[in-house]
């Protein structure tokens, strides 16, 4: 009932804003995970190894910092709302372009361009959401917003299980273009961030009127340098977190398909179950962070992922794998559920539209080769078996998440109503 109470306290404007940001992130993730479910089909179509196909995921992740930088600058300059609309349309169109790639190299280019668009959404959406929502219940909304990523994964799993056999991988990417319609909802129902509007007063003085793009880039980099300590910490933290999520998610459907020879329907069932666990974990741990603190919540969730490894990686029964997956993603996304609020609270007001997303995606860049390395190690050291690689990934990265988090600090309840 407490969860319902948080929503009831929102105004209609705040609800619409949160829904738009949640769906923007969900559908962004949906488009990314379509690739993850189609790895085996792409390998067969383009006559490449799994490790080669995973380069498409690498280029998507590697280009996300550029998107976070460009769209973040745009959000700080012209507003969160129009930037979010452009962002949604862009990632939908590049997803559609992927469906018609005639060769693997062209496919890689479309995925790199998709990565630029994907990289912009999280930072812009999170800034718009948390600058509009009240401070009360921020931990709950942080967990729920981050689990938009899980909802996207869940939708991709449902679509894969029901229509892949009829439309193939190209049809899946065509379906991935449908999120573009969300831009209409943003146009009609969402208002600009009140914090961003308030922050425009200093620009109206004329001091910054007509700034060129390079002057704005220089000003941003100067801001980053003045906050170098927190920026470096956030990048390292996001490297650990992105390795945690992508290391447990990106190759898991391929593990179920290739190592265990499960059908699309069975894979879809397991994916749905563990994403329900992820959704519950993100919301519950996000809410818990309001009571026991951001850092303590992250550390508990990360370390509790380790005991789930035997069921998650070494079971052969569908039911046990589903339980293991549920527990694993409950913890992984439980830790992630704290991040949107934590990063925005730690970020200085003047660069909140850019810094959290840029740090997030820079950390993503550093971890972007993760799935390729996992696939190569499985192919070269374990005869194509993904289980030991997945298991060791969790042990090492969960410990890293806990250690880095413990070394940082938090500003739970910080004022996010101003951008200057």
Predicted segments with their positions:
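Cytosolic juxtamembrane N-terminal segment immediately preceding the first transmembrane helix
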Residues: 1-32
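Extracytoplasmic gate region of multi-pass secondary transporters
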Residues: 35-36, 227-279, 367-371
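Extracellular/periplasmic helix-loop-helix junction of adjacent transmembrane segments
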Residues: 36-66, 265-266
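Helix-breaking motifs and short loop linkers at transmembrane-helix boundaries and internal kinks
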Residues: 47, 79, 100-106, 134, ...
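Central cavity-lining transmembrane alpha-helices of secondary-active solute carriers
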Residues: 58-72, 272-284
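Conserved MFS/SLC helix-loop-helix module at the cytosolic interface between two early adjacent transmembrane helices
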Residues: 66-102, 289-292
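Cytoplasmic helix-loop-helix junction between adjacent transmembrane helices
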Residues: 110-147
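Helix-loop-helix hairpin linking two adjacent transmembrane segments in secondary transporters
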Residues: 145-188
């Amino acid at each position: 009932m407490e969860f319902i109470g948080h929503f009831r306290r929102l105004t209609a404007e705040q609800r619409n804003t949160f829904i738009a940001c949640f769906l923007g992130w969900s559908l962004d993730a949906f488009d990314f995970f379509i690739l993850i479910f189609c790895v085996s089909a792409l390998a067969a179509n383009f006559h490449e190894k799994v490790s080669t196909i995973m380069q498409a995921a690498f280029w998507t992740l590697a280009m996300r910092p550029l998107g976070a930088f460009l769209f973040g600058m745009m959000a700080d300059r012209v507003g969160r709302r129009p930037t979010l609309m452009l962002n949604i349309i862009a990632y939908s169109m590049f997803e559609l372009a992927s469906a018609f790639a005639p060769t693997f190299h062209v496919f890689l280019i479309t995925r790199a361009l998709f990565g630029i668009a994907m990289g912009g959404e999280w930072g812009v959406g999170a800034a718009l959401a948390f600058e509009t929502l009240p401070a009360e219940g921020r931990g709950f909304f942080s967990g729920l917003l981050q689990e938009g990523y899980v909802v996207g994964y869940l939708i991709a799993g449902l679509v894969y299980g029901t229509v892949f056999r009829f439309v193939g991988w190209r049809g899946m990417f065509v379906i991935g273009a449908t999120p573009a319609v969300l831009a209409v909802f943003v146009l009609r129902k969402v208002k600009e961030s009140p914090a961003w509007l308030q922050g425009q007063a200093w620009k109206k003085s004329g001091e910054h009127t007509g700034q060129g793009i390079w002057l704005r880039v220089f000003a941003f980099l100067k801001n980053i340098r003045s906050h170098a300590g927190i920026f470096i910490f956030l990048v390292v933290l996001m490297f650990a977190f992105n390795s945690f999520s992508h290391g447990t998610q990106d190759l898991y459907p391929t593990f179920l398909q290739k190592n265990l020879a499960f059908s699309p329907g069975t894979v879809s069932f397991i994916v749905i179950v563990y994403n329900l666990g992820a959704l519950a974990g993100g919301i519950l741990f996000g809410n818990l962070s309001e009571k026991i603190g951001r850092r303590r919540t992250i550390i508990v969730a990360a370390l509790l992922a380790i005991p789930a490894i035997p069921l998650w990686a070494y079971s052969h029964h569908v039911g046990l794998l589903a339980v293991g997956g549920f527990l694993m993603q409950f913890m992984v996304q439980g830790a992630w559920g704290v991040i949107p609020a934590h990063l925005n609270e730690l970020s200085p007001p003047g660069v909140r539209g850019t810094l959290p997303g840029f740090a997030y995606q820079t950390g993503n860049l550093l971890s972007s080769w993760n799935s390729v390395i996992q696939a190569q190690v499985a192919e070269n050291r374990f005869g194509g078996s993904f289980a030991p690689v997945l298991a060791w990934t969790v042990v090492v990265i969960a410990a890293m998440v806990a250690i880095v988090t413990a070394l940082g600090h938090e500003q739970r309840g910080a004022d996010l109503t101003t951008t200057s």
